[in-house]
Amino acid sequence: MSGQLNVAEDSVLLDDISISSIQPIVSDVPAAEDVGDEDHISGASIAENRPKDPTLVKYHAACQRGDLKTVKDMIEAGVIDVKADWDEEEQVSGLHWASANNRLNLVRYLIAQGADVNIKGGDLEATPLHWASKSGYVYIVHCLLEHGADPLITDRQGYNLLHTSTFSSEVMLITYVLFTGQIPVDSPDPTGKTALHWAAYQGDPNTVEALLKFDADVRVVDTGGFTPLHWATVKGHPHVLKALIEHGSDVFLKNNDGKNALMIAQEMNTQKALQNALYECGFNKDGFAIRKYFKNPMHAKMVTFFTPWLILGLILSFFAYFSILLAILGCLLTVLAAGYGLYNFVFPSFILMKRIVIFKTPLLAGILSGTIFWLLYVWLFKMLPATFDDEPILNLTVFALFAGVVFLLTKLLQSDPGYIVPATDHNQIRATIIELLRVGKYDSKHFCIHSWIRLPLRAKYKRFVHSVILRYDHYCPWIYNYIGFRNHKIFIYFILLLDLGILALAKLCLEYFDELKDHAKNKDALKCSILSKDLCAGFTYDPFTLFLLEWVCVQGMWILALSFVQFFECLKGVTEHEFAHWQRRNRGVVGREHVFNTAPEELMEEDPEEERNKLRSLGAAGQRHCCSTLTTATGFDRFLSVIGSSLGRQPRTTHNPINYPIETDYGWKQNLKDFWLTSDISAPMWRRILLPPVGTRGLLNGQEVDYQKLYNLPERVISIEEIV
């Protein structure tokens, strides 16, 4: 069984998993500033409790807490010999303790003084490289390897650097080790388990993904006949199971006990996870291929896109020509039948998810385009013939506006929001990693663990399309596409034309109803208790058009709210994604995304937000109401949030007494210029305003920047009001 990795962004929450190992490991000894003679270390020793050399105890404690001054004083005074700085029975050196506690400066100093980087110590006879890698300390591992540490050395259990790195579940370290190219990805331990076996057993999707990208063998078996899929089934992590199945794991392969993955899942109560993974890979619960009714996924998407055109026409007809009860019944039956057909016969051909997220299908885009289709239909065949003589300018305006809407919608559906192609050149990727290590920024905030590129500022990786998007704004299900640097301006023009088109069409529709009223044969029949005479004429003589107008006005409300949000964010020089992050930051709420970072303290830049993260609580972030899906789809959640911020109602928490400025806000005038003007100053002004940016270059604070290589923001002057 094999297939292409296609994980829906919203359904896969791998980014929610925190595998940070920034906290140092310490022994039993309290890490006091001054270690007295009575202190002792016993945490990682094979020796029993016994009196120890107080000088060695003090030295090891200093190595643990990174006290470089004390270590230097003891070595330079001759009290400690760095080439024999261990207890004879334990064999745990100062380099072991410094490595295990992420003390980079101390590690460098000890190596410079002649410490053996390959010395084995402790009950597992492990090297400093093993100690550092088990904690995920990539900077220490890099330093040790640069100074001659052997990655192929194994400890007493037979684990090499790749195995111990896998145990840490620190994906930044795993990626680094793989790109060194010094260890075969399928190197086994004494029981025949590879790193992929261990990662699968741990339920570590990020490590599994990295190993599979390096062509780790999914069919290799250990001494018990277990494949990585067998061990993944024991753990039951659905995303790990899915990745292994997609890369060719055989669900029917049996281990030495004669059990396949299906049997193990039943014994370990992980059947649901395995069945979900099988389904998302195109197989039923028994492991056999699901029938797909469309060989070409694009054909299935087209059916999904055009289905709302028909459904919308039927629903409007039901309400126009049947009683309210029959109309509601007809609508329910139509929607249920359409949903059943799409879910069972259409969706499986292009998206396989147990819980289909309609946002990730062209369905909502079909609703929007279907609405436009029926609007054009009633305008062309009903309103235009009846009103052109009296309202020729208004009719031409409606035609021009909706011609623009159709053109821009077609363009948006096919547009590139600013994708960055994932890196494939291993030498280039390796150089990027080394550079980030050099500057202390090798973490998932600056390096994409999925596409292996250095992440520019304002960019974001989206798993649904397996790409990083420049100046990412948001995902819009109504155009079935992401909004980013290259199509953001088109999107705003689109919603602006929609707003104007709805207003013009509503006015023309009222003129049309007025014509119906004037030409009515029996004007006494126009009796409506709550409607005006014009609307009453529409209800009496053309209810289809009246209900379509009502539907369009409802749509117009959220489009108007979306327009307000977009223009507000343009004024503030911020994207929707950045604005949401800024609000969470000011509320003191921890986001779902975690930065995988094991940089030593001496390399970490001061970031007050990281300190505040320790005090934050998810609190209100986890609260959701019954209409959350609806408000998210229509954008009203962002509208209400923007209204609150514009009125100065940004909440503050006990742990967050100040408001942080928006880093990309250079003043509303400059922000508007940066957004609306392309960076090509030689082009005519109308082209700079109307056309979207070409390539990856744009304006920021009036300066031309390459958004694909934007690693530092232009300087920004902070006003007194922002400081107070």
Swiss-Prot record:
- PANTHER family, alphabetized: ANK_REP_REGION DOMAIN-CONTAINING PROTEIN-RELATED, PALMITOYLTRANSFERASE HIP14
Q: What is this protein called?
A: Palmitoyltransferase AKR1
Q: Which residues form the DHHC domain?
A: 446-496
Query: What does its UniProt record remark on the domains?
Result: The DHHC domain is required for palmitoyltransferase activity.
* Pfam families the record matches: Ank_2, DHHC
- Report the source organism: Eremothecium gossypii (strain ATCC 10895 / CBS 109.51 / FGSC 9923 / NRRL Y-1056) (Yeast)
Q: Which GO terms describe its cellular component?
A: early endosome membrane; Golgi membrane
ANK repeats mapped onto the chain = 54-84, 90-119, 124-153, 157-187, 191-220, 224-253
Annotated EC: 2.3.1.225
InterPro entries the UniProt entry points to: Ankyrin_rpt, Ankyrin_rpt-contain_sf, Palmitoyltrfase_DHHC
GO-annotated molecular function: G-protein beta/gamma-subunit complex binding; protein-cysteine S-palmitoyltransferase activity
Q: Where are the catalytic residues?
A: 476
Q: How does it sit in the membrane?
A: Multi-pass membrane protein
Transmembrane region positions?
Answer: 309-329, 332-352, 361-381, 393-413, 490-510, 544-564
Which family is annotated? Belongs to the DHHC palmitoyltransferase family. AKR/ZDHHC17 subfamily.
Q: Please give the catalytic activity noted in the UniProt record.
A: L-cysteinyl-[protein] + hexadecanoyl-CoA = S-hexadecanoyl-L-cysteinyl-[protein] + CoA
Localization terms from the record = Early endosome membrane; Golgi apparatus membrane
Which parts of the chain does the record assign to the membrane side Lumenal? 330-331, 382-392, 511-543
Q: Which PROSITE patterns match?
A: ANK_REP_REGION, ANK_REPEAT, DHHC
Q: Which residues lie on this side of the membrane: Cytoplasmic?
A: 1-308, 353-360, 414-489, 565-724
As for what it does, the entry says: Palmitoyltransferase specific for casein kinase 1.
Biological-process GO terms, alphabetical: negative regulation of pheromone-dependent signal transduction involved in conjugation with cellular fusion; protein targeting to membrane; regulation of endocytosis
Task: Tell me the SMART domains matching this sequence.
Answer: ANK
Q: Which gene encodes it?
A: AKR1
Q: What class of enzyme is it?
A: transferase
Residues folding into a coiled coil are none
SUPFAM superfamilies per record: Ankyrin repeat
Signal sequence residues: none
